[in-house]
Regions:
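NAD(P)+-binding Rossmann beta1-loop-alpha1 motif at the extreme N-terminus of oxidoreductases
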Residues: 1-58, 85, 121
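Short, contiguous strand/loop micro-motifs
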Residues: 2-3, 88-89, 172
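General structural feature for long, well-ordered alpha-helical segments within catalytic domains
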Residues: 7, 11, 15, 35, ...
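Rossmann-like NAD(P)(H) cofactor-binding subdomain of soluble oxidoreductases
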Residues: 44-52, 56-57, 64-129
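Rossmann-fold dinucleotide-binding core
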Residues: 92-172
């Protein structure tokens, strides 16, 4: 299975590496961080192209404006997605914006999960992250084998998009 992974920074690079080592084919876009040499990923020029080439797209980005730009901006994931695909945002962002992003993807027939993590760089490297997921149970079940390559404590917080982000905020307090 091809997984698009956008955001290969401190957290995203080790997460993508775990997926590659598990046998998933990784597709990514040129970004600020240099591509890890052991990742053996296909590199394309836009988030839309990542979406076209992948069954599932994962984003792990610094903040809400970055996620919005990558998902909904020009040449963003939404432009390249189609019915039956799944977007998983693992960034820690606004639950309100998350619900709005999810609605736009659902209109395109694309599934959407918010799945922020706790555990930091150490957890990302050790594949021991806590993953707090918001979205439909059927999409959670579809993504669970992927989550199990990234974390140890994986919970569907609620079947509403934004539930994972809300839990993450509460976890930070």
């Amino acid at each position: 299975m091809k997984i698009g992974f956008i955001g290969l920074g401190v957290m995203g690079a080790p997460m993508a590496r775990h997926l590659a080592y598990a046998g998933y084919e990784i597709v990514t876009v040129l970004n600020r961080s240099p591509l890890p040499t052991d990742l053996n990923a296909s590199v394309v020029t836009s988030a839309a192209e990542v979406a076209r080439m992948s069954e599932i797209v994962i984003t792990m980005l610094p903040d809400t404006p970055d996620v919005e730009r990558v998902l909904l901006g020009q040449n963003g994931v939404l432009e390249g997605t189609s019915a039956g695909k799944l977007v998983i945002d693992m960034s820690s962002i606004s639950p309100i914006d998350t619900a709005e992003f999810a609605a736009k993807f659902r209109q395109a027939g694309t599934g959407y999960l918010d799945a922020p993590v706790s555990g930091g760089e150490v957890g990302a490297k050790a594949a021991s992250l806590t993953i707090m997921v918001g979205g439909p149970a059927s999409e959670f079940e579809r993504a669970l084998p992927i989550f199990q390559k990234l974390g140890k404590n994986i919970n569907l917080i609620g079947e509403t998009n934004g539930a994972g982000q809300t839990c993450k905020i509460a976890n930070q307090i």
